[in-house]
Amino acid sequence: YEMSASLVGSEMCIRDRNLMNVVIAIDSFKGSMTSMQAGLSAATGIKRVYKDAHITVRPLADGGEGTVDALVNGCDGRMTQVQVTGPSGHPVVCPYGIVDETHTAIIEMSGAAGITQVSGEEKNPLNTTTYGVGEVIKDAIQNGCRHFIVGIGGSATNDGGVGMLQALGFGFLDKNGNQIRFGAKGLEDLESITTDHVLPELKECTFRIACDVSNPLCGEQGCSAIYGPQKGATSTMILQMDKWLAYYAALAREQFPHADAKYPGAG
């Protein structure tokens, strides 16, 4: 980045010695550099060539890692955090943003159910859960938030958001009336969905999803087939999860007519 930025800086000097304002906004590089690290590195390169440049570095994100930082920075929000259930069932501390003026929470799914939070044998979408995401939403509601922006990139999960909804009071029950197990494997036992104990404040809430893909829930372009391998799924797991998610989607649509597994981005 410093080398490329130096070249850019040199070109700017040649074109116009008075051009001193530079805005840098670079998305993060998974597993290597955050958005701000990349931006500051580029800024260092520019400064080496054009010492008088006025440089503004801003975080940028696509719905995955860095989304909270980018939006909180741009919306004059503040950061808070809460301990929740991580993707493998162990506690994790999830930071999220709050914009008090609009009662809006900005949440990264990757902060509570992220692929970087699992390793080795824990990297298995049959077992990983989104329960912690629901716990973050619940905490934000208790902090007065009624509007939510949720970035869904970078997750370690493939449970169709069931864990998240369980944390918010939805019942996903097996044939014996018990909550199904965490992870995609729990969907194999799903028989019914109940709403008797749903958090009542959810009726007052709005949700917007930050996402840069258009995959449907199931099929050759669905979440299991496209994103399952990077989450640790084998070819057998992919077929199983796709089948279970299709049944889950059909069951959900019976109760919630607007639920559409083919909606772009549902996967």
Give short role names for the model-derived ranges.
Residues 1-16:
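Single conserved hydrophobic/aromatic residue that forms the stacking wall/gate
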